[in-house]
Amino acid sequence: MAFQGTSRTLTQQSSAASSGDLQKILFSPDAIKKMATECDLGRHHWMRADNAISVRPLVPQVTSNNLLSFFKSGYDAGELRSKGYMSVPQVLCAVTRTVSTDAEGSLKIYLADLGDKELSPIDGQCVTLHNHELPALISFQPTYDCPMELVGNRHRCFAVVVERHGYIGYGGTTASVCSNWQAQFSSKNNNYTHAAAGKTLVLPYNRLAEHSKPSAVARLLKSQLNNVSSSRYLLPNVALNQNAAGHESEILNESPPFAIGSPSASRNNSFRSQVVNGL
């Protein structure tokens, strides 16, 4: 089915065979593996002294080659309206420190276009995080779609750039950066409203809280009372109200920390602080 100029999805604009080819390019086992090994999608990237500047493209080189060929052949055949664009609505980075808070150092994180030799931050979206501020969540929103093209011998696409500064005397890993995004590819492009880079400082997970509260005592007391045969000693399925421990109600209903991005975490964001635990 040839392209007819309507605003339809890419798979509708191309033939069924071409759609299958595109799916294979993006979601084959090899393509998924390359996204992990070359781009660190969803993986922890360690910032070390011998890796002070990290440039991670959002699309692997092999995938870029295949996408470029796919769109070019469709464009030359008159089936697609362009040679292809890459669209990334948002890039989210979770950053945690791996040294003590008194270590003097910082991270500079930004989104760049590999078509720019200087690798300047896109629209000034750049965040600097000092070691004592971590953990934190960072978000970037590109204001345009990136053409799938070659610039010299470089494949043009967006990239996450992380620069490590300071940390004198710390040769090992001082911070971990875990980036997530969802790249989209289409034969049409757009421009988007400019938004400043987001920076959210996150409360560290208090793993000592469960050991500092007498919740175990309250649970034991409730269990013993509920096992008494007389109904007048049966407790309803509610938290105990103890004068000796006024915060037991909160303790008994306390849930373990949720992982970032889980459905349970999103439902509970309205009443509990979000934490970064083990990113």
Curated annotation (Swiss-Prot):
Classification lineage: Viruses, Riboviria, Orthornavirae, Kitrinoviricota, Alsuviricetes
InterPro entries (UniProt xref): MPV
Principal cellular location given in the protein's record: host cell
Chaperone found in the keyword field: no
Keywords linked to the UniProt accession: Host cell junction, Transport, Viral movement protein
Function (record text): Transports viral genome to neighboring plant cells directly through plasmosdesmata, without any budding. The movement protein allows efficient cell to cell propagation, by bypassing the host cell wall barrier. Acts by forming a tubular structure at the host plasmodesmata, enlarging it enough to allow free passage of virion capsids.
Entry similarity comment: Belongs to the cucumovirus movement protein family.
Entry annotated with the keyword RNA-binding: no
Compartments where located: Host cell junction, Host plasmodesma
Recorded GO CC terms: host cell plasmodesma
Protein name: Movement protein
Pfam families named among the record's database cross-references: 3A
GO terms for biological process, alphabetical: transport of virus in host, cell to cell
